[in-house]
Amino acid sequence: MEKNNLNEMRKALLEAASLLQKSAKVGQGVDEAADMLMKDAIYTTTSGAFAQREHLDTQIGDITKRNTPFLDRVPKVAANGKTHEWDMVTALGSNDTAVGECGTPLENDATITRYSAQIKTYATSVKVCDLAQWAASDYFDLMNLHLEKGMRKILQDVEKKIYYGNHDGSTPNDFTGLYKLIADYAGAENTINASGNAISQTYVDNAIQVIVDKGGSPTHMFMGAKDLRDFAALWANKVVYNDPSAGMTFGYNVARFMSFAGPIEIVLDPFLTASNSPNTPNTDIFIVTMDEIALAQTEPMYRLPVYRALDLAETQTVVWNIVLELRVPQWTVCVKNLG
């Protein structure tokens, strides 16, 4: 039985190699040949029988993925100058860093640090030992699976930190989010305290008025599920959405708010929750001029070379050095403490 399987596998590989050789001459069929090689070569032996392995990275990604709407909209720009770029790079070697100059980060750890004002290094690492490599057979897929989830974790960390960062100021060299940047640099009127009351059009209009009075033109309003639900309820008796062609679809559309200063996109962000807010159990919303906000980076998220330690384990790391730039703080408002 095993001999027959080996013969079949050898035959399939020869056919794929022949097709690959032919495609090199005519410029066609490369993808088909590669698929054949992959299908017939990725096998492992279990009790003498052949079985093709199936990886669940796609399914796991679907289960764990959460949207990051702010990162999807904010411009990604290069570091603004040599000093800025140098600070980002040297953050790798600073104290209590995610990635030491002469070491490796902790396994499966997402840490945050920075070297100078507003600089932060986000990193995640995966360490796979020989035993896990043997158990997984094609262990590079196992490592990549971990890294994919690590990269998703980095994006989620950044999404949360963009809003709140180190809002209490207990660590001067930590990442500062919109909440504290507004409080520190935009003026008292740019933080509107709802004092536990629910969101209302008055709060939103007052926030827009502050931005317009200072020369801005707000473009986006970010809020969590609770506040979006309350805000939508305000219009339930005014704007009814009905799509006869879609059967029983009904409700109200809150995709945009037509304010006195023009249309503002309403964005639901799953990371704007009471547990993340400094005003928990209450929440906050942010009205921003997105054109004047940027995420500076030395380069896009990248991988460090694989490191093999003395314990015969391999470590691979993903790093992202970024800084949140709020170019005109006066054009951003936080309505905080919404009940």
Give a label for each model feature.
Residues E2-T44, A49-F50, E54, D141, ...:
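Sequence/fold signature of self-assembling virion shell proteins
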